[in-house]
UniProtKB/Swiss-Prot annotation:
Site positions per UniProt: Reactive bond: 5-6
Keywords of the record: Disulfide bond, Knottin, Protease inhibitor, Secreted, Serine protease inhibitor
Function per UniProt: Inhibits trypsin.
Entry's free-text remark on domains: The presence of a 'disulfide through disulfide knot' structurally defines this protein as a knottin.
GO cellular component, one term: extracellular region
Disulfide bond residue pairs: 3-20, 10-22, 16-28
Keyword Disulfide bond recorded: yes
GO MF annotations, alphabetized: serine-type endopeptidase inhibitor activity
Family classification: Belongs to the protease inhibitor I7 (squash-type serine protease inhibitor) family.
InterPro entries linked to this entry: Prot_inh_squash, Proteinase_amylase_inhib_sf
Name this polypeptide is given: Trypsin inhibitor 1
Subcellular location: Secreted
Amino acid sequence: GICPRILMECKRDSDCLAQCVCKRQGYCG
């Protein structure tokens, strides 16, 4: 899958879109 290149803050993977995961810096990627 593809993670949309949108800067989104997160606390967990489910806060992110599609195939994105929550990275350590607190943003989806």
